Amino acid sequence: MYTRPLARLIEELQRLPGIGSKTAQRLALHLLNRPAGEVEALAKALLEAKQTVKHCSICFNWSAEDPCEICRSPQRDPSTWCVVADVKDLIAMERTREFKGLYHVLGGLISPMNGIGAEQLRIRELVARVAREKPQELIFALSPSVEGEVTMHVVKDYLKPVAPGLRMTRLAFGLPMGSELEYADEVTLARALEARQEF
């Protein structure tokens, strides 16, 4: 049906999250209709991002510099950290403009059904960092799901021996159970951050 280069482009676009065959086809045809300079700029931006953007060695945010801008900023409060599952959750929290502390990106949530255990996440790195930097509070901004709950409690158990006095809070529930944090609007997230609770 498609010439081979077009079929390959559609196939590659379909690998992206949330892109089905119809959307991939629409994007591919759109790209073919654009001027060559625009398509080359997109290709260059993709390659440059892939080659230069790496995980921050401290918090595991994506950054072209190490440490990332957040970890380097003297305006951030080093006594309060927000623990998130993924960088997209960090971005969601930053959009609220309410959180002024530092972050730690776990790299996912514990999900035995998907073969993801504590050892696949950056829990050891968090424990070492907490022991070294001694924050006063960790705010868990994990999606309100079974996986989020399990992850929170496992991390808490890992941290107890190294930081017995550490205050650990979670976002208040204005977020529906089973929802994804990245899809929450800024106002809901800001209110959940304000009304966080000990757990």
Curated annotation (Swiss-Prot):
It comes from the Bacteria. The keyword Metal-binding applies. One of its GO terms (molecular function) is DNA binding. PROSITE patterns: RECR, TOPRIM. It holds the Pfam family RecR_HhH. Signal peptide: none annotated. Residues 79-174 form the Toprim domain. NCBIfam families: recR (TIGR00615). PANTHER family: RECOMBINATION PROTEIN RECR. Belongs to the RecR family. May play a role in DNA repair. It seems to be involved in an RecBC-independent recombinational process of DNA repair. It may act with RecF and RecO. This is Recombination protein RecR. It comes from Synechococcus sp. (strain JA-3-3Ab). The lineage of its organism: Bacteria, Bacillati, Cyanobacteriota, Cyanophyceae, Synechococcales.
